[in-house]
Amino acid sequence: MEEIKKRIIFLIDKINKTNYEYYTLNESSLNDQQYDALFRELLYLESKYPEYNYKFSPTTKIGGPISSKFHKFLHEKSMLSLNNVFNIKELKLFYDRISKKISNFTLLTELKIDGLAVSLKYKKGILDKAITRGDGYQGELITDNVKTIKELPLKLKEPLDLEVRGEVYMSYESFNYLNQIRKKENKSLFANPRNAASGTLRQLDSKVAAERNLSIFLYTIVNPPKFIITQKSILEFLTYLQFPVNNYYEYVLNWDQLIKKISYYEEIKNHLGYNTDGIVIKINELSFHSIIGYTSKAPKWAIAYKFKVFKTETLINNILFQIGRTGIVTPIAELLPTIVDGSVISKVNLHNFDYIKQKDIRVNDFVLVHKSGSIIPEIIEVIKTKRKNQIPFEMITHCYSCNTKLIKKDSNHFCFNLDCEEKKIQELFYFVSKSAMDINVLGLQTLKILFYKGFINNISDLYSLNQYKKEVEELHGFGKKKFNNIIISLEKSKNKCLSNFLIGLGIKNVGIHLAKILAQKFENIDNLQKASIESLLKIDEIGIKSAQNIKNFFLNSKNLKLIEKFKNLGLNLFYFKSKNNIKNNIFKNKKVIFTGILEKYSRNQAQNIVIELGGVIINSITNKTNYLILGKNPGSKLLKAKKFNIKVLQEHEFEELIK
C-alpha cells in the first residue's frame, strides 16, 4: 500500500507541474498522450484507493494557475474542460451511459481545434471583454489582443448582451511564416501553432498580436436565448451573427452514424490547414444537459475523442549523452530535423541503454517518431527494412565529463564522482530552477560560463558572486546591467520559503510536495536536521526509504557545512507560517470558497494559504460551507452565501485573520 500511495503522490506532483507548464507557461514537459496516460492512471488509482484521495489532486481541478502578467477576471460560468476517450471501445461506454439515462437524443460532432480557449463578452453588440480559460474559474483579460483577429466581429449585427466561447488558433500557413521571420531575426522558433497562438495572445503589445494573424472558431453561447434549444442551433445562430464557426460539424442520429462520422474526420484532418487533435461529441438537445449533469471538472454530456497519434519517419544522426545532477547518464538521439504537427523535432530521449537494446536502436537508423502537441517525441519503432550496415550501439563505459567509470544500477548508468563538473553544473541549474530558488536570470549557459571561469563551484558560491563583480561584468554577453540583475535576483531569493530551499538541496525523494510537508512539520532547518527516522515516519507521506534518505543527507558532514554556510549568507531557513503558532488552526477542517478577484493575492496563492492553515477548498456553496472569501466583482456565490447564512470575509478581514 505504501508503494500505491507513493505512486499517487508522484502522479499528482507530475500532473500539477505539467498543468502549470501548459496553462501558465505555454510549454509542457509531457506530450498529450503521456499526460493523458498519467491522468487516467491517477483517476484509476484514486477510485480504487479512496483513502489516498488528496485535496490537492489535479483530478479536482480544471487547469493551471493564472499568469501574473494580465488583469484577472472571474468567469460567471466556469470554463470546464472535456474528458477524453482514445478508442471506439471507450467511446461506446460514453454512448451507453447516456443511453441508459435518456432516450431519443441526438448528437453533434465538432472538430477539436488545438488552440487556446477564450470567452468573449459583448455588451449591446460591442465586444467588451476577452478572457482566457485560466484555471477554469478565473482567466486573464486579453481583449486588445483578441480584437486583432481579423475575422472576429467587434460589433454584432444586433445590439445583444452575449457571452460566446471559442478557440483561438494559428493556421499552419501563418505559423510557418512567423517562424521564417523569427529565424531571419535569430529569434527562437515556436514549437507548434498552439504555442505560437498562446504566446501571441499573451503579448503585452497588441501590435505584435496583429502582425501574427491569429484566427478563431466560436462554438458555444453561455446562457443562450430561450429560442435556442440545440447545440446545432447555437452554431447556426453564431453563424447568423457573423461569427467564424467551423463548418465541419455533423448531426448524428445513432451509434452507427457516429462511427461513420469518425472515419470521415480521420480522412480530412490532415488537409484542413490548421491543427486538430480530435472530435468533440455533444448531446445536441440542450434540455438534456442538466439531466446528464457535470463533474467538477467536465460536463458528462460531452466527450473528446482523440485521434490516433500522428507519426513521422526520420533519421538518427547520432546518439549523445547528458548527465543529470544525480549522476544518471541519459542517451539522447540526435535526429534529422523533422516536423510533426507543426513542431520541429531534432532530439529524442532514449532513457537508458536497456531501452536502446530492447528497441535495437542504432546510429543512422530510420525510425518512426510520434508526438501529440509537445516537442518531446518518442521513437515508436525502428524501420529495419531500411537498415544497411549500421552497427549495434555500445554504451559508453566512462563518464564523458570526468572520465570516471560508470556504474550500472537497475536499468541506468551512473557517474558517482562527486567532483564531476557536469553533475555540479546540473546541481546549480536545479538549485536556481523555478520550483526551488526561482533565480530565472541564471540560465544553464550562464551557469556554465560562471562555473568554467571559476567563479562558482557549488550552490553556496552563487551568493558570493559579488566578489567577482569586475571580472564577471567584463565577460562577453554580461556587462553591468546583467550582473546587477543577477545579484538582485540572488538577494531576493534569500527570502524564499524553507520548502524552496529544501527542493534546491536536491535531497533524494524530496520533491515539491514532500518539501512543503517537511517545512510545515519541522518549521526550520535545525529541527529537520535533528529529526529521527521514527519522527519522519510519523508523517503519512514518508516511507522508510524517504526517511532514510533525509536522515542520511543530514548526517553527511559536507551537507552540514553547506547548510551552515547558507545560514551565514543570510538565507531564510524557516517556514514562513511558523512565526505565529496561534493561527495554525484558524481554518482547520473548515470548508472555504472564494468569489471575485483579490487585490493582493492570486486565487491560487490565497487557496494555498487556506490549505496551509488546515482548511479545505471547495468549488460550490452548500449549507456546510464555513467561509466565503470575497473579492472584487463577485459572482453568484455571494447570493448563495447570504441564503445559507455563511460567514463572508472581505479581503482585508481575510488578511487580518491570517496575519
Curated annotation (Swiss-Prot):
Keywords: DNA damage, DNA repair, DNA replication, Ligase, Magnesium, Manganese, Metal-binding, NAD, Zinc. One of its GO terms (biological process) is DNA repair. It comes from the Bacteria. It is an enzyme of class 6 (ligase). It catalyses: NAD(+) + (deoxyribonucleotide)n-3'-hydroxyl + 5'-phospho-(deoxyribonucleotide)m = (deoxyribonucleotide)n+m + AMP + beta-nicotinamide D-nucleotide. The keyword NAD applies. GO terms for cellular component: cytosol. InterPro entries: BRCT_dom (IPR001357), BRCT_dom_sf (IPR036420), DisA/LigA_HHH (IPR041663), DNA_ligase (IPR001679), DNA_ligase_AS (IPR018239), DNAligase_adenylation (IPR013839), DNAligase_N (IPR013840), Hlx-hairpin-Hlx_DNA-bd_motif (IPR003583). Zn(2+) binds at C399, C402, C415, C420. The active site is at K112. Its EC number is 6.5.1.2. GO terms for molecular function: DNA binding; DNA ligase (NAD+) activity; metal ion binding. NAD(+) binds at D32, Q33, Q34, Y35, D36, S81, L82, E110, R133, E167, K282, K306. NCBIfam families: dnlj, PRK07956.1. DNA ligase that catalyzes the formation of phosphodiester linkages between 5'-phosphoryl and 3'-hydroxyl groups in double-stranded DNA using NAD as a coenzyme and as the energy source for the reaction. It is essential for DNA replication and repair of damaged DNA. Belongs to the NAD-dependent DNA ligase family. LigA subfamily. This is DNA ligase. The lineage of its organism: Bacteria, Bacillati, Mycoplasmatota, Mollicutes, Acholeplasmatales. The gene is ligA.
